[in-house]
Regions:
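Extended, subdomain-level signal for the structured scaffold at the beginning of enzyme domains
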Residues: 1-93
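Conserved small/polar residues in nucleotide/adenosyl-binding loops
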Residues: 98-99
Length: 99
């Protein structure tokens, strides 16, 4: 069974983030919501607070088959500015691409 991580940054587009989570869970897929900060609570672009399942520092990237980065003006900028996440995505892609 596939395991998915969706990374949430303050300012993420709620529709793009939560719809993915909803559909995956309805299909029986495992998807973890991950805050890119040390706080589990993330604020969406329309000021809707969302509580993630874990924080970035708690993620073992080797457990995941798919990484999701939802859009949203400020959320996208915050994802891109998160250097630890960008490094992990590069490493994840390098390993995935070779298999």
């Amino acid at each position: 069974m596939s395991k998915i991580a969706i990374f949430l940054a303050n300012g993420f587009e709620e529709i793009e983030g939560l719809t993915v989570v909803d559909i995956c869970r309805r299909c029986g897929l495992t998807i973890d919501m991950v805050s890119i900060t040390e706080e589990k609570q993330v604020m969406g672009s329309h000021k809707i607070p969302v509580t993630a399942d874990m924080t970035l520092s708690q993620v073992n990237f080797e457990e995941y088959d798919c990484l999701v980065l939802p859009g949203g003006g400020q959320g996208t900028k915050n994802l891109e500015a998160c250097e630890p996440l960008m490094q992990q995505i590069d490493a994840f892609y390098a390993v995935s691409y070779t298999h």
